[in-house]
């Protein structure tokens, strides 16, 4: 059994089954996903987890950020919105999809139907993965379980790409990991309650943070519009990252302890870089306060 760090035990003394082990990957959707994929791959030297390819009604490619894969998705047909945005988080279930659905029902968590995706290999069809949409905040993004049927093989690809990133010294930015995915919700109390039901986790404070082993944490913050607001990425040295981004003209806001990649350079996404040795990621309120108080005079906006 996979066990989620921080799982609580039931009053009877028996531990109920863990439902989620980690953030398996997260993804962005863009009208120009392949161009962004190539930019992150070549400019930031992120190793390939899987090459950009068409899968029928969508196309995607994946790159590693150390402890998690980032998927670049291009959807075929009309989208409700244009541009680029972080759009979804895939959670790995502890067991298979059928067991996960049974546990979702037991916990009273609203969810969608099982959806199997079929791959064709050597003329033979096989189920590559099964997903289950979770009806939990934010409304502006998709949170879902993703059950890869060849999980060891998938994990091996992730691990090899992560090892390659480490061998490259994290690339020119010195990337080590994704520290946090920040989700904006209109009601932190409501959203936190639904995430707690899913994860058996009791976060504290005004901005609840849910932890997943060595993967990225998920932070919930109050926002007028629901969705995935930003990611916080750990780097070896903010000085090194600042110099690289300055040289390339892609440095955004730079304040004490953190820097931001210029959103226009990455499709409008907000990607915050913090030094890995720092004790924790800044809260969104702290980040906004620092940004207002100590804007770098050389920062392009």
What are these regions (language model features)?
Residues 11-34, 84-91, 147-190, 226-233, ...:
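N-terminal beta-strand motif that seeds the catalytic metal site of vicinal oxygen chelate
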Residues 101-174, 215-219, 239-301:
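Vicinal oxygen chelate
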Residues 74, 208, 219-223, 232-234:
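A structural feature that tracks compact, well-ordered secondary-structure segments
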Residues 7-9:
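N-terminal Sec signal peptide cleavage junction
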Residues 224-227, 254:
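Alpha-helical subdomain
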Residues 18-20, 27-70, 112-126, 171-217, ...:
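Core segments of cupin and vicinal oxygen chelate
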Residues 72-113, 118:
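Hydrophobic/aromatic-rich structural module bridging two neighboring secondary-structure elements via a short loop
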Residues 1-5:
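Bacterial N-terminal signal peptides
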């Amino acid at each position: 059994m996979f066990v989620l760090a921080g799982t609580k035990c039931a009053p009877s003394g028996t531990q109920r089954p863990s439902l989620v082990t980690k953030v398996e990957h997260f993804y962005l959707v863009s009208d120009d996903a392949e161009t962004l994929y190539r930019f992150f791959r070549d400019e930031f030297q992120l190793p390939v987890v899987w090459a950009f390819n068409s899968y029928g009604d969508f196309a995607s490619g994946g790159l590693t950020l150390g402890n998690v894969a980032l998927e670049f998705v291009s959807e075929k047909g009309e989208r409700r919105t244009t541009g680029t945005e972080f759009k979804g988080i895939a959670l790995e279930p502890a067991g298979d999809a059928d067991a996960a659905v049974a546990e979702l029902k037991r916990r009273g968590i609203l969810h969608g139907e099982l959806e199997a995706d079929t791959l064709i290999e050597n003329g033979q069809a096989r189920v590559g993965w099964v997903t289950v949409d979770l009806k939990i905040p934010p409304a502006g993004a998709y949170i879902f379980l993703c059950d890869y049927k060849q999980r060891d093989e998938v994990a091996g690809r992730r691990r090899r790409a992560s090892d390659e990133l480490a061998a490259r010294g994290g690339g020119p930015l010195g990337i080590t990991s994704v520290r946090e995915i920040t989700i904006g919700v209109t009601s932190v109390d409501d959203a936190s309650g639904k995430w707690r039901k899913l994860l058996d986790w009791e976060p504290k404070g005004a901005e609840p943070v849910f932890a997943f082993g060595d993967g990225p944490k998920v932070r919930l913050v109050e926002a007028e519009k629901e969705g995935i607001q930003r990611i916080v990425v750990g780097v070896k040295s903010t000085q090194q990252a600042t110099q690289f981004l300055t040289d390339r003209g892609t440095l955004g806001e730079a304040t004490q302890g953190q820097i931001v990649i210029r959103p226009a350079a990455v499709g409008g996404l907000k990607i915050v870089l913090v030094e890995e040795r720092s004790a924790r990621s800044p809260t969104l309120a702290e980040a906004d306060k620092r940004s207002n108080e100590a804007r770098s005079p050389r920062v392009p906006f």
